[in-house]
Amino acid sequence: LVLGGFLNIVTQTGALEAGIQSVVKKLKGNELKIIPILMILFSIGGSTYGMAEETIPFYGLLSATMVAAGFDTFVAVGTVLLGAGSGVIGSTVNPFSTGVAMDALRGIGIQPNTGIILIVGAILWAASTSYSIFIVMRYAKKVKADKGSTILSLQEQEDMEKTYGQAASKEMPFTNRHKKILMVFAFCFVIMI
């Protein structure tokens, strides 16, 4: 609850949107590179502290970003959902899955080997994240090359352009205030982990 509120406050400042727009602008012509970067970040969040419902603010934010980069909203959903989901699948130190499971084992008299759990989690994390990135990247390349290859219906495509085409056109400057907010944001995640 607190984490969701914190994410909402940071989102309301516009720092996340301005930061992502800045990255997209720097990657102009190489927009595909933003997908694995974001998916790995979401995946690390999923693996370390169980980032799942905390990703809700990112759907709208990334939808506008992905449409501006020449993709569709399905790429944004895949980036967030599969990124965070693959992290949760490969939980390493996630207190909500790994921590609870280890406590449950101790409760029935089985002493878990933390090293093995970390290794298995890391292997699952790497495999699921890599495969998720592959799937989203393959679809994104297809949509970028041919807008007609999207799985969205014509009505959904029109709605996407009406909703996010306008949002993508308004550019936000990436100010020093935004940079400071994102540094505090990143620092808080490091402390949580």
What would you call each of these model-derived segments?
Residues 16-27, 101, 105:
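Hydrophobic alpha-helical segments of integral membrane proteins
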Residues 45, 81-94, 120-134:
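Membrane-embedded alpha-helical segments of transport systems
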Residues 88-119:
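Transmembrane alpha-helical segments and their short flanking loops
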Residues 23-89:
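Hydrophobic transmembrane alpha-helices that form the pore/transport pathway of multi-pass ion
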Residues 1-17:
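Core transmembrane alpha-helical segments of multi-pass membrane transporters/permeases
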Residues 115-193:
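Long, contiguous bundles of hydrophobic transmembrane helices that form the permeation core
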Residues 11-16, 45-54, 97, 193:
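Transmembrane helix-loop junctions in multi-pass membrane proteins
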